[in-house]
Amino acid sequence: MNLGFGFAEVLSQNYDVDASSDWQPISEYDYTNDKVKPTISKIWNTTYSCIANLNIMLGNLEKANKAMFQDNEYSLCFGEGLGLRGFLHFELMRLFASSPAMNGNDKGIPYATEYGKNIPVQKSVNETMDFIIADLLKASEYLEHDSLYASKSPYTHTQRRYYYNYYANELVLSRAYLWKGDKENALREFGDFLFSVINAGRLYHLNPDTALELSNRK
C-alpha cells in the first residue's frame, strides 16, 4: 500500500489530504512526526525483508541442481529474483537517497546481494544505481526465456501476465536509466520494449512510426 497508493502518493501531493487525517504530516514532509515515523520504518524494514527473502531464494538457486527444473523454470525464477531485487532497491533509493541529479556522490542505501547479518557498506548514489542497473540487465538475460516474451501461445501470455516478467523488467530498467540521468540508454531500453511488443502483435496497439519517433527522441 505505502509504495503503491499510500505514502508515496501523499508525498507526491496527488491527494487532497484533510487537516485531521493521519496523512497530513506526510503531506507536509514532517518525517519526524510520531505518526509518520512508524510508516517510514515499516517501508524500510518490510522492503529489506523482501530483499532478504529474494537473496535466500537466489542463493539456493545458485546451489540447486538445474536438472530438477522443467523447461525454462530455472531461468525464470532467477530472472524474477534478480529483477525484483533491483526494483525494490530502486524504490528505496527514490525514497531514502538523494537523486543522482542532486548529488550523485552522496551516500545511497545499503545494497544487499546476499543473505546475512552484516549490513552492506553504503556506496555513493551513482555506485548504488550501477548495482541496480547491473541486476536489471542480468535479469533481462534470464527473462528472455519468459513465455510472455518468447512464446506465441495465448495461454502462456495469460499465465505470466501478473508475474515480474520480461516487459516489466525492461520498463524498470528504462526508469532506472532515466533516474540516473542516462537518457540515451533510457530511450534505447524503452524503444526496445515498444518494438518487442509491436513485433509480438499483442498486448498493445501502437503505430510503428510513433514507436520509432519515441525511441529516437532526445
Task: Outline where the language-model segments fall.
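Conserved, well-structured interaction surfaces
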Residues: 21-96, 123, 142-143
